[in-house]
């Protein structure tokens, strides 16, 4: 693997193709998007558990993109090019992780952790206190050797929910590009 970073594009919906400048796109690494994210045409992988979005992305994705879906949904599209079944997430079984029941961004994050990387960057990640934040923190705790980077928008503030986690950093896009150039590419 030439680039040791996996970037997740979450469910927030604020990160549009015009925000993906050349420098950022060269440093983003493997891109996994949640469902029909605005950047699905640029993605290496699309993770979806929404039947309508699955139908759309299977028919409209870029040629290089692989679509990942839960087994029940995957079975309907098995003959399409570049669609795969999401893996069995052994590390998440004790949490009763269900690929059909979680959000698409959580499915994308679980997939990134399953693929494995020393650094996983979260762009456009929707933080929501009832379901998303507990799931996100649980996954981050299961993978303590993975550095998670929560990439803030240019005018966004840091959030305090990750203060107790040593493997989480909150940085902006400029800091992300600098960090990638300085450290990640050298791994």
Task: For each feature predicted by the language model, list its residue ranges.
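Metal-ion/cofactor- or nucleotide/acyl-coenzyme-handling active-site neighborhoods
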Residues: 1-187
């Amino acid at each position: 693997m030439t680039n040791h970073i996996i970037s997740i594009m979450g469910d927030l919906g604020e990160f549009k193709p015009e925000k993906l400048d050349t420098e950022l796109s060269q440093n983003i690494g493997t891109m996994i998007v949640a469902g029909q994210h605005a950047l699905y045409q640029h993605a290496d992988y699309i993770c979806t558990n929404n039947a309508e979005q699955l139908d759309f992305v299977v028919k409209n994705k870029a040629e290089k993109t692989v679509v990942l879906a839960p087994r029940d949904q995957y079975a309907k599209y098995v003959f399409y090019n570049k669609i795969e079944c999401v893996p069995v997430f052994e590390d998440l079984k004790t949490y009763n992780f269900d690929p059909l029941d979680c959000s698409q961004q959580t499915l994308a994050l679980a997939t990134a952790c399953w693929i494995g990387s020393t650094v996983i960057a979260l762009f456009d990640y929707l933080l929501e206190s009832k379901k998303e934040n507990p799931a996100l923190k649980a996954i981050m705790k299961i993978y303590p050797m993975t550095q998670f980077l929560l990439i803030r928008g240019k005018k966004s503030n840091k959030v305090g929910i990750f203060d107790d986690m040593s493997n989480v950093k909150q940085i902006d896009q400029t800091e992300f590009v600098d960090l990638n150039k300085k450290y990640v590419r050298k791994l």
